[in-house]
Regions:
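Active-site-proximal helices and loops of the catalytic beta/alpha 8
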Residues: 2-112, 120-132, 136-138, 143-155, ...
């Protein structure tokens, strides 16, 4: 057992901690075998291996524990326009050693600073393009939805992120920001005009459509997907070879988080008609390298 303040011990792999929390899961499943068990563990160093132990626990029985996958900084670096620390390839569950898709990835949570707040405070710029501009920043949040929610597996959305909520987590009732105000009441979107702001409602609509596509198309149930990120031009390829070629069985997701226009090659795996799932237009691809 670790002593108070011994972070080295706490952050190391601890088999007693693994077994205690396995016991909690066993107890819950004894009452409801179909229930989900989700841990907010956020392990690092050796304790990250504990997450693998839990994710794969009783996996042959169709169980296993889900783990929160905090990618707040990685995603916020993208939305702010900074390539450093913007890689989120590790959100592929097998990178963490998980047998099944038990990683609950998220960009925002109750413990993290609001992405839009940081976009507007610290966003990058190039010429007339400025991430600190509200309309511009909200457009970038749409792209965030595309590269977060389409990744196969469960995801978490923190309240009002879908409206580009931009009050700091440390917002005080006197309109200042202070660490001591973290749990203070925050402005409610419906009372400050968010729901009638067309730019914010547009983020909501785009995210809703992406999530709807995720829920209603079996291609996203696959384990066969790749994530390539870290240069502000992330690409996700999703393939479900169990589906018919007449079904939606291949998806390519690309985004541009730089501050300038980019010529990004989608690298379609084959030629023919491809469909834009957002605007429902058709693109005839004749060159897989273009």
């Amino acid at each position: 057992a670790c002593t108070a303040g011994d972070d080295t011990c706490t952050n190391a792999f601890q088999i007693d901690r693994v077994n205690i929390l396995r016991g909690y899961a066993d107890y819950q499943w004894s009452w409801d075998p179909t229930s989900y068990v989700i841990f907010e563990h956020l392990g690092n160093n050796g304790s990250a291996q504990e997450e693998t132990e839990w994710a794969n626990y009783r996996i042959n029985e169709g169980k296993g524990i889900m783990l929160w996958g905090k990618a707040t900084n990685n995603f916020n670096q993208n939305t702010m326009g900074y390539a450093s620390d913007s890689n989120f390839d590790w959100l592929k569950h097998t990178v963490k050693g998980f047998t099944k898709k038990h990683l609950v990835a998220y960009a925002e949570s109750h413990d993290e600073e609001r992405m839009m707040y940081k976009n507007l405070q610290y966003g990058a710029s190039s010429g007339t393009y400025n991430v600190k501009d509200l309309k511009t920043s909200l457009e970038r949040q749409k792209a965030l939805g595309a590269v977060l929610f389409t990744i196969p597996g469960p995801k978490m959305l923190w309240q009002f992120g879908e409206l580009g909520y931009d009050y700091s987590i440390n917002h005080c009732q006197d309109e200042t920001n202070s660490d001591g105000c973290r749990t203070n009441p925050k402005p409610i979107p419906s009372e400050i005009g968010y729901l009638t702001n067309t730019d914010r409602k547009s983020v909501y609509d785009v995210w809703a459509k992406i999530i709807g596509l995720k829920l209603n198309n079996k291609v996203f149930e696959t384990d066969n997907y790749t994530i390539t990120s870290g240069d502000l031009k992330p690409r996700i390829q999703i393939t479900n070879n169990l589906l018919s070629t007449s079904d939606l069985y291949e998806v390519i997701v690309i985004a541009n988080f730089t501050t300038s226009t980019q010529a990004i090659a989608p690298l379609f795996p084959f030629v023919g008609n491809w469909y834009n799932l957002m605007d429902e237009t058709t693109l005839n691809v004749t060159n897989t390298n273009s």
